């Protein structure tokens, strides 16, 4: 499975690692993904989902339903 947040679609970012002597090399900045088991109140069931910590913080603030609706994700597929 790819390293993509199933809720927000966040994926890796291409960046540069810069040394002290200013030699630049490419590096991949991965998303901080966590496997979580979340209670979906509206569907009355647990869902297992791989989400980023930023999405988890948003869920704690506004709720799972609102975050899923904002990102156009159908929670019935989980």
UniProtKB/Swiss-Prot annotation:
This is Large ribosomal subunit protein bL28. It comes from the Bacteria. GO terms for cellular component: ribonucleoprotein complex; ribosome. One of its GO terms (biological process) is translation. PANTHER family: 39S RIBOSOMAL PROTEIN L28, MITOCHONDRIAL, LARGE RIBOSOMAL SUBUNIT PROTEIN BL28M. Pfam families: Ribosomal_L28. The lineage of its organism: Bacteria, Bacillati, Cyanobacteriota, Cyanophyceae, Synechococcales. Belongs to the bacterial ribosomal protein bL28 family. It comes from Prochlorococcus marinus (strain MIT 9515). GO terms for molecular function: structural constituent of ribosome. Keywords: Ribonucleoprotein, Ribosomal protein.
């Amino acid at each position: 499975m790819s390293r993509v947040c199933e809720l927000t679609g966040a994926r890796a970012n291409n960046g540069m690692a810069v040394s002290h002597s200013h030699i630049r090399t490419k590096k991949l900045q991965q998303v901080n993904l966590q496997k979580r088991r979340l209670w979906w109140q509206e569907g009355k069931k647990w869902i297992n989902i791989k989400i980023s910590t930023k999405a988890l913080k948003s869920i704690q603030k506004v709720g799972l339903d609102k975050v899923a609706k904002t990102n156009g994700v159908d929670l019935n597929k989980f």
